[in-house]
Each structure stands twice: as structure tokens, then as C-alpha cells.
Amino acid sequence: MDQNKLKQEAAQRAAEFVEDGMTIGLGTGSTVVYLVEAIAQRIKDEHLNLTGVATSVRTRKQAESLGIPMKALDEVGQIDLTIDGADEVDKHFQGIKGGGRSHLIEKIVAINSARNIWIVDETKLVDTLGKFPLPLEVIPFGSGKLLQRLADEGLKPAYRLNEDGSKALTDSKNYIIDLHLGKIEHPHLLAEWLNKQVGIVEHGLFLDLVKTVVVGTTHGPEILDAHRG
């Protein structure tokens, strides 16, 4: 089955977790595009009263264009549910996010949410994190020195570039440095070290935030729940 079809089916299944009256966080990425469409359709069909909080400019624009009422994070209380994609998810429900350059805002929204659900296709499930490059959102000033420090630690860093060779910018006008690690044996220790490095605004390790993952498979969407083991 086409990978986009798997994403679409998983997104449609995840949209079923949305309930009337909720404030919902809307993630960023190719899978979330289908999610926003599915939620907008539910609002139209079921007359749901929802408020959305977007994690990126492009998600907000899509949601508003489809009639989903949107507010900024500081304009709402706690978010009831945030649904987002992920670039990798391991068997312990830890993940890497940031392929879409939005992991800083995604993490801020996630930690302010009562519940987080990820939607992925089955290719994103891994035994060990790290094959997907780990993104770091970094302050532009002094980023070259930071890049060298990361290289000295053996973390194989590289600026993320646009097609024209310019440095890719986040919505917050920061740079992205990707770490090409191959395998992350101890994600919590790595996260702790990265948190101490001056110049790194946020890393793409999302640890201990999610208990439910909706997976698009060739046999239909499957729900993985950490509480069920």
C-alpha cells in the first residue's frame, strides 16, 4: 500500500480521539496534513466545538483555511489533546521529531498538553533511535563554534540546508543542525548532555511524552498503547 495512504488512514483513526469541547494541539508534517483534513471534516459533519493550537505557521494556515478555530498557546488553558507525527518511534515510545523544522514549538505544545498521541506509518517504528538524523534548533550567533564542539564530541553534525545551499530557518528564525548518529543507545543521557550546551535552543528527542501511537499498516491502522504493554 502507498505510504501516503497509510499516513492518511492513521490520521483519520487518530482524529477519532478528538471530542466535542476539546482544545487540541495540531502538530506539523505530512501526516498531520491528513489529520487536519479529518478533524475539519468532523467539525463539519458533527458540528463539534473545538479550538486548535498549531505548532507551525503552515499547520495554522491549513487549519484556518478549513474552518478550524485557532488560538495561540497563551490564549488557552491546558490543551486537552495534541496529535502529531514523528520521524522515529522506538519500542519504549520514545521518539525523534524535527524533520519538519518545528520540534521546538511542537515540544512546547506537547508539554502543555494533558495527552499526546503520535501518528506514523509503520516505517517509522524502530528498535533503536538514531537512523533518522537528530535535529537541533540552534541560535545562529556562534553556531559555527557549536557545530565544531559537536563534531569534537563525535556527533557528526551538519547544518540543514535549503536547495539553494542557504541554511534552513525555523519559524523562530533559528538554524537547524542535524546529528547523524546512526544509533542512540542512551537517549536520556544524550538529551541531558544536549540540554546543557549553550546555543542549543531545543533538540528533537521527545522522551516520556507519549503513551499512544496510531500506526498506519498495510492491514489498517493499529493503536499501540504503553499502558497495555
From Swiss-Prot:
It comes from Lacticaseibacillus paracasei (strain ATCC 334 / BCRC 17002 / CCUG 31169 / CIP 107868 / KCTC 3260 / NRRL B-441). GO terms for cellular component: cytosol. It is an enzyme of class 5 (isomerase). Pfam families: Rib_5-P_isom_A. The active site is at E106 (proton acceptor). Catalyzes the reversible conversion of ribose-5-phosphate to ribulose 5-phosphate. Its EC number is 5.3.1.6. GO terms for biological process: D-ribose metabolic process; pentose-phosphate shunt, non-oxidative branch. InterPro entries: NagB/RpiA_transferase-like, Ribose5P_isomerase_typA_subgr, Ribose5P_isomerase_type_A. Belongs to the ribose 5-phosphate isomerase family. Keywords: Isomerase. It catalyses: aldehydo-D-ribose 5-phosphate = D-ribulose 5-phosphate. GO terms for molecular function: ribose-5-phosphate isomerase activity. It comes from the Bacteria. Substrate binds at T28, G29, S30, T31, D84, G85, A86, D87, K97, G98, G99, G100, K124. Homodimer. Pathway: Carbohydrate degradation; pentose phosphate pathway; D-ribose 5-phosphate from D-ribulose 5-phosphate (non-oxidative stage): step 1/1. This is Ribose-5-phosphate isomerase A. CDD domains: RPI_A.
